[in-house]
A protein has these predicted regions:
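A cross-family phosphate/adenosyl-ligand binding-site feature
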Residues: 1-215
């Protein structure tokens, strides 16, 4: 099988030296890529800017902005069996990007933001998709409720949710998986490398069940 995996943050430029981003380290996405490779599968890893070396057996695509990640994902989704959208893609970007560095000249500066294109939602809207679609959700409260709502709104097959205060910029995480049929599965706090191997098993099992239903 072929796994398409996104990882890391995106950077939305304000001017040539400043940007909007987030604290995602990319460790979870990279660990999933390694686990899928260990299981003998092909991997397409689409990554925002991180301080990690890509798995040498993966097809690696480096991006910076949400638009670049959107385009790369759509280019490769249909050739994939499992799409794992683990990246922390910016929800908003500056409406205008200054071609020169913005100078400090006032006590307050307003920055107009507009929505970025929603990668998970755009894949969920595809008719007759053949790939398993997995989204991720980092939350600070109401973990299961927010994950369930995201699953329904984005029309994906499962959501892997975590408390952002536990998993951000660390080597460990604690996960709650919400499935399309309403079932949930909790994986207790553990190293991300261990969690990644458990997730790959779950993804493969879900994809096999999906294929069986379609036959």
């Amino acid at each position: 099988m072929t796994f398409l995996i996104t990882a890391g943050p995106t950077r939305e430029p304000i001017d040539p030296v400043r940007y909007i981003s987030n604290r995602s380290s990319g460790k979870m996405g990279y660990a999933i890529a390694e686990a899928a490779l260990d299981a003998g599968h092909d991997v397409i890893l689409i990554s925002g800017p991180v301080n990690l070396a890509p798995p040498h057996k993966a097809k690696f695509i480096s991006v910076s902005t949400s638009d670049e990640m959107f385009d790369a994902v759509h280019q490769h989704a249909d050739s994939s069996d499992v799409c794992v959208l683990c990246a922390a893609v910016a929800d908003y970007k500056p409406a205008q990007v200054s071609p020169v560095k913005i100078k400090k000249c006032a006590a307050q500066v307003s920055l107009e933001l507009i929505r970025t294109r929603d990668i998970l939602e755009s894949l969920g809207q595809r008719q007759n998709r053949q790939f398993l679609l997995v989204g991720f959700a980092a939350e600070t409260d109401h973990l299961e409720a927010n994950a369930t709502r995201k699953l329904r709104e984005k029309n994906c097959d499962m959501i892997v949710a975590n408390d952002a205060r536990i998993g951000m910029e660390t080597d460990e995480n604690e996960l709650l998986i919400v499935f399309r049929n309403g079932e949930t599965k909790k994986i207790s706090r553990a190293p991300k490398t261990f969690l990644a191997h458990e997730l790959v098993k779950i993804f493969l099992n879900s994809q096999q069940k999906s294929l069986t239903k379609k036959m």
